[in-house]
Amino acid sequence: MCTQTPARLTRGFPLALTAFATLLSIVEPAVSGAQDTRLDPRDTTHSQKQAPFFTKKDAILAGSFVAATVLMFPLDKQAAHALQDSSTQTNRFLKHTTTDVEIITSPGAYIIGGALYAVGRLGKWDRMADLGWHGTEAVLFAQGVTTVLKGAVGRGRPFLSDGTDPGDYHPGKGFSQADYTSFPSGHTSTAFAAAAAVTNETTRWWPRSVWIVGPLMYGGATAVGLSRMYHNRHWGSDVLLGAAIGTFSGRKVVQYAHGHPNNRLDRIMLRTTVVPDGRGGVSVGTSIPLP
């Protein structure tokens, strides 16, 4: 009886994570929106009085992620076994879907972000350029944090032990061996960074979109995390911490960018001019702000 309880709990992990992400998709951008009510939602060209960069609500959100990650550690093995069950692994729909969502995330996040930025600059659609650039910034920041942690922690990926040893840590080994870069999940942090950036960016100028964009973006990000577990590349706790890093990266990049519209990167990237050169090409011009 006792040995079956963890299994029952972990079989429900995908549903629990999906429910958590759905709640996050609504609550998290609403929190950001409440902090930004005094901001001009249209662009980053006007500086206004800001709420504190980190708030009590941020602390609650971070604490929830940390608690979920810590609680997941003892259940990592059972969750891995549940998703590696033969009936799950032979499901054709899951096989194709999990592969597709991973490709959309990496390298898809960079391609989509870059395309939105380029189209926004070419068409002089500032909101689209903001969306593409800030989304890409968030993904890059999340990846930077994730990469350092992966290398430092050196946690073995589940397939090394056939999902039996979630405690396989070799600090520093992740910098030299990819098989020891399990914690946290890079695909998940990328997906949640993009989800948070897009959701928070769009709710600045379309507040009601939180009920549409939020569930779509965070739901997709959750699918990415579950796909990494399905492919036996990550433990459940890897996914949860990756989600935390990505969520905060997306939130804070957007908040900082709109709170500091004259920051150097935005002045360069969002004030670049792209015009036809008369020869079938384009001419790109920008100004480099001096210190």
In which residue ranges do the predicted regions lie?
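Active-site-surrounding "flap" and adjacent substrate/cofactor-binding loops of secreted or lumenal enzymes
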Residues: 79, 84-99
